[in-house]
Amino acid sequence: MKIRIEQTSVEENEVILRCAQLDDEMLRVLSLLRSGMQKLLVWNEHREMLPLSVSKVVYCETVEEKTFVYTHDGIYQTALSLAELEDRWGDLGLFRAGKSSVVNLHEIQKLKNCGSGRIEALLTTGEKMVISRHYAPILRERLGL
C-alpha cells in the first residue's frame, strides 16, 4: 500500500482512498478513519456537555459506577462504560488496564514489570497506572513484547 500526503490550503481536510478492491485491509483503514472522527461526549464540573477528541484522553476510570475521563486539560465525566469506550476506540489506542480503568496506549511513556504478572505504566501526565495481571499478557501481545 502506498501512502501519499499532500498539504494544501483547503478549508476542510479530505481523505481519498484509492484501491483496486475494497478488501479487509482497506476496510480496516476506513474504520480507523471513521472512528478517529467520532467525538466522545463528556461533561465538565459545570455540567456543560462537550465533544472531546479521543486522542486527548490519557486514561479513564470508573468510581462508584461513574466513568471519569482524564486529559491533560482536566477531568470529565461520560455516560459510556469502560467496555463501550474500549469497544468504540480500542483501535485508536484505548486499552483495558483493569476492572475499573482504560488507558490510552499513546499516552504511556514507560512500562515496568512489577511482579505477580502486572505491569506499571508511567503516563505522560507523570501518573502511574497498574495494568492488571489479567490484561498484562494482552498488552504485551498487542505491543509485540
Go through the PLM ranges and name each one.
Residues 1-27:
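N-terminal regulatory/sensing modules of transcriptional regulators
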Residues 27-124, 128-130:
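Conserved binding/recognition cores within well-folded domains
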Residues 141-145:
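Short hydrophobic/aromatic patches at helix-to-coil boundaries
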